[in-house]
């Protein structure tokens, strides 16, 4: 699987990691940058705490930055 790890950077995931994910959350700073983002690979869709949104998918490069999709 090939997943984004940053807005324009991809990586071939480790064996067994067939899920790409994109976590997003408001860091509470009121920043004009908007939400914080975390990209990655996983074996299963990660469990997140309340207030964190997560999108998981299982095709190559399926977790792009929302503004670059």
From Swiss-Prot:
GO terms for cellular component: extracellular region. SUPFAM superfamilies: Snake toxin-like. The keyword Translocase does not apply. PROSITE patterns: SNAKE_TOXIN. Its main location: secreted. The keyword Lyase does not apply. Expressed by the venom gland. Has the length of long neurotoxins, but only 4 disulfide bonds instead of the 5 usually present in long neurotoxins. This may explain why this toxin has the low affinity to alpha-7 nAChRs of short neurotoxins, which have only 4 disulfide bonds. Binds with high affinity to muscular nicotinic acetylcholine receptors (nAChRs), whereas it binds with a low affinity to neuronal alpha-7/CHRNA7 nAChRs. This is Alpha-elapitoxin-Lc2c. It comes from Laticauda colubrina.
């Amino acid at each position: 699987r090939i997943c984004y790890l940053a807005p324009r950077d991809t990586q071939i995931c480790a064996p067994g990691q067939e899920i790409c994910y994109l976590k997003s959350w408001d860091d509470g700073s009121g920043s004009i940058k908007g939400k914080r983002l975390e990209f990655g690979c996983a074996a299963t869709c990660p469990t997140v705490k309340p207030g964190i949104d997560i999108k998981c998918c299982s095709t190559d490069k399926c977790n792009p930055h929302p503004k670059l999709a």
